[in-house]
Amino acid sequence: MAKNTEIELKLLLSREGLEKMLQLDFMQQAMRPDSYKKRRLVSTYYDTADMTLTQHGIAYRVRDKGDGSFEATVKTSRQSKDGLSERLELNLPLAEAKPELNGFAALGLGYELSELAPNSVHALFTVDVERITYILDYAGAVIELAIDKGAIHCGEKSDSIDEVEFELMSGTVDALLELKERIASQVELRAEERSKFARGLALLQ
C-alpha cells in the first residue's frame, strides 16, 4: 500500500442492517477490544471563487477533530467502482480551524497550493457528522470501520449523511473486498459511489 494513499470502501445500510452487521460473528471477532471511539467531526471545504482547486481535481478541507485539534486535508480526484476508491490523501496539523495553504508540496502534492493568495479561498460548505469507529483485524489486514451520521450544510440547503466506510490501514485490497462480500452475503447493502465532497458540490448548483 503506497504512502499517503487512501483506499476506502463506502457503503449504505439501513439502521437495521448496520446493527445486524455489527453483530455478525466474524465482525465481532475482527473488532479489536476497546477500539470503539465516538466523536463529532466538523469539516469545512474551501476553494477559490473560480473553483481552481476543484478544476485541478483537488478537494481541500479544514477539520475540527472534536478533541481540540485541527487538520487540513487535501484529497485528489476520487475514482470509485462498487464503492471502492483509491486516491492521494495528505494531512497537515493546524493550530486553529483556518485554511493553511503552505506545506502540502513537501508532503507530495504536485500542485502548489501556496501559489494561491492566503485570502483567495472561501468556504463552500460544511460537513458535520457524528463518527463512530472501530479497528478491525481481518485476513491479515488492519481496517478502520467508520459509521457517519450527520449532514452536509450549504447555505440554506442540506443533505443528510448516513453511511459506513471501511478504510484499509494496512494489508491488501483483497481483504477489504472479501470482507465486503461476507457482509453482503448476510446484510442488504448498497455501494455509495459519491464522496462527501461531490455531494457538497451538488448542493452548490
Q: What is each residue range found by the language model?
A:
Residues M1-Q205:
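Phosphate-end processing signature that detects enzymes handling 5′-triphosphorylated RNA
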